[in-house]
Design a protein with these regions (language model features):
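A conserved beta-strand/loop capping segment in the N-terminal third of enzymes
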Residues: 49-101
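FAD/FMN-dependent oxidoreductases across multiple families
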Residues: 212-299
Length: 371
């Protein structure tokens, strides 16, 4: 296959296809889903993510993105809130990914839906549900899905939790209380994020321990009730809430803290979660995916190689990933969450300080967008 093959139509893959096609490159993108689909994601768009999307020509307002100005932290005994220091946005991945893919197609990329990549072989051939091909340039942006032959080594990462996501219709009073906020609820063995998205739906996305899931017999309704009983604020929000999906989305084995280190002679390009996975409480996962796409396409368009790109990514994101992962490890110690929320109540400005340690730096974003 001549040109570039992008595997995966999420944020990183779609952004890469869009930028390369706009630069005149021949690009084919494979997306496993035949139609727009929901994905496990907190759907919090930080200012960094918004800057990358604006550079790609995406209009979040036109898509109905919801504004978020404040963060509210809750534990079993405490609640505290603070301004974010910027206006975040919230938009379903189904709407966001679809819009990016439409822009990529309009720029000249060939978008093929319903194609499932199965393996990358040693000779560079990619086997798929529609046959095999050997692309001139391969970009792997499969998100949380592993691809045989080019998997991630999760050793040393935080990959033991279970992830769930549900959309809910909250009671009017609870919806009003949540408007303009992202709520982070901290409980034993995990945490949950809750925020409004478009069409007056609420996104509940959370991580729990396998032990809790097993103790509750694998019952999702029972799990929500258990979490709501531990964190009263979450219980208030969930009271009377109506699920909007037939069943929740679920995932396991996500290697939080992963940062890809290239093997000698490695020629493929990894983007998004296939290159780096930052703990989701930072709200920077989508920003990091878009940042990786920007760096990789800059490398491709300027004649640099995968090793150069990965070095740039490690320079920009390695410290934040390490610090966020260390913070998540620390959060599992007894009493940490209560102390953290109490401290935030006394000093709301700590939110900005914490964000500075666990997110991409403004200089890194400016440098990437200038490339």
């Amino acid at each position: 296959m001549a040109g570039v093959l992008v595997i995966g139509g999420g944020l990183a893959g779609a952004a890469a296809a869009l930028r390369l096609a706009s630069a005149g490159r021949t690009v084919t993108l494979w997306e496993r889903e035949r139609t727009p689909a929901h994905k496990i994601c907190g759907e919090f768009l930080s200012w960094e993510a918004q800057a990358h999307l604006a550079a790609l020509g995406l209009d979040l307002e036109a898509l109905g993105a919801v504004a978020i100005e404040r963060v509210r932290l809750a534990t079993a005994r405490r609640v505290a809130e603070a301004p974010l220091g910027f206006t975040a946005r919230s938009l379903t991945r189904r709407a966001l990914d679809s819009a990016l893919l439409e822009l990529a197609a309009a720029a000249g990329a060939t978008v093929e839906r319903g194609v499932i990549a199965r393996e990358v072989r040693a000779d560079g051939t990619v086997a798929s549900s529609h046959g095999g091909t050997r692309p001139e340039t391969l970009i792997v942006a499969t998100g949380k899905h592993e691809l045989r032959g080019i998997g991630r080594d999760g050793a040393g990462t935080l990959n033991g939790q279970l992830g769930f996501k549900a959309y809910l219709r909250l009671l009017p009073a609870q919806r009003r209380a949540l408007d303009g906020h992202v709520e982070l609820c901290l409980f034993q063995g995990g945490y949950a994020g809750l925020q409004m998205v478009e069409r007056e739906a609420a996104n509940l996305c959370f991580l729990v321990s396998p032990e809790r899931w097993k103790r509750l017999g694998g019952d999702f309704a029972g799990l929500l009730a258990d979490l709501g009983a531990e964190v009263p604020l979450l219980g208030q929000r969930l009271a009377g809430a109506v699920p909007l999906l037939d069943r929740p989305l679920a995932i396991s084995g996500v290697p939080y803290g992963y940062l890809h280190r290239p093997a000698p002679g490695e020629t493929g390009w990894r983007l998004g979660d296939q290159a780096a996975v930052i703990p989701s409480f930072t709200g920077d996962g989508m920003s990091l995916a878009l940042h990786s796409a920007r760096l990789a396409t800059t490398a491709l368009l300027t004649g640099a190689g995968p090793a150069d790109y990965l070095a740039w990514l490690a320079r920009d994101a390695g410290g934040a990933i390490w610090r966020a992962t260390a913070l998540q490890r620390w959060s599992s110690t007894g009493g940490w969450a209560e102390r953290a929320v109490a401290l935030l109540g006394l000093a709301p400005g700590l939110v900005r300080l914490a964000a500075g340690f666990t997110r991409l730096q403004p200089a890194a974003v400016r440098r990437a967008l200038a490339g």
